[in-house]
Amino acid sequence: MSALDNRLFAKMNGIGNEIVVVDLRDQPAPVTPADARAVAAHVPYDQLMLLQPARLPGTEAFVRIYNNDGSESGACGNGMRCVARQMFAGSDKNGLTFETRAGLLNCWRGPADGLYTVDMGEPKFGWQDIPLAEEFRDTRMIELQIGPIDAPVLHTPSVVSMGNPHAIFWVDDVNAYDLGRFGPLLENHPIFPERANITLAHIVDRQHITMRTWERGAGLTKACGSAACATAVAAARLKRTDRTVEMTLPGGQLTIEWRDNDNHVLMTGGAEFEFEGRFDPALFAGALDPTGA
């Protein structure tokens, strides 16, 4: 028996990032990686957002985040906007606080209808915090390349943690590279002991960046909120952009602000409801891991 048997779910998207939201606040039973993979086979998604009972005073829920391969993620900005939309519906609150593996996240109604803002917390730059497999004193750009030594295809990425590891490669044209081919190679590179999200980014001007991302555990996606945050921060660290930028992703636009006063990163964008349904228990009948996970 799965904790997801007969549970209501909402299929949503955050500028094209495919999200499934399930409210399990009345159900403390755990959801397994095998359950998460079974859901992905039935309702394709990039991230599965599970609202579990709150563990800390002042929070609405503990949000557990699964990628579609059954691995867990500490952060998903687009998914949190979808969660915020669901929780704000029928509520007169202007702000909500959630706990995730990456820490506390605050969400607000955005500056216009249909927009939501998520405080993604502080970025981390230390090589052990990202983490990397070896020491780099300066993570603004590290020595890493793919392709021939004398003519690398991609090289010298910036690395950042936004609760999950990110590597950003600066390019002239984000569509000129086969990210579906290079993404999994770089995601699983030995330098990233916990794997990494891989982004190709082009700085248009000081207020605008275009980007594409291969998401750790999900593959090519139309949008990755934490990658947009990491990319904006990395560009500002290199002094190539201002601290507030517009991000163009395949699925749409995000506004990212890296605040001076507290070092927190704010992400603002849309969240769309698509449909809702209920999980058939038969979906999880064979969802067993040989490890028992």
From Swiss-Prot:
Its main location: cytoplasm. Its EC number is 5.1.1.7. GO terms for molecular function: diaminopimelate epimerase activity. It comes from the Bacteria. Gene3D superfamilies: Diaminopimelate Epimerase, Chain A, domain 1 (3.10.310.10). It is found in: Cytoplasm. One of its GO terms (cellular component) is cytosol. GO terms for biological process: lysine biosynthetic process via diaminopimelate. Substrate binds at N17, Q47, N67, G77, N78, N164, N197, E215, R216, G225, S226. Belongs to the diaminopimelate epimerase family. Homodimer. This is Diaminopimelate epimerase. It comes from Rhodopseudomonas palustris (strain TIE-1).
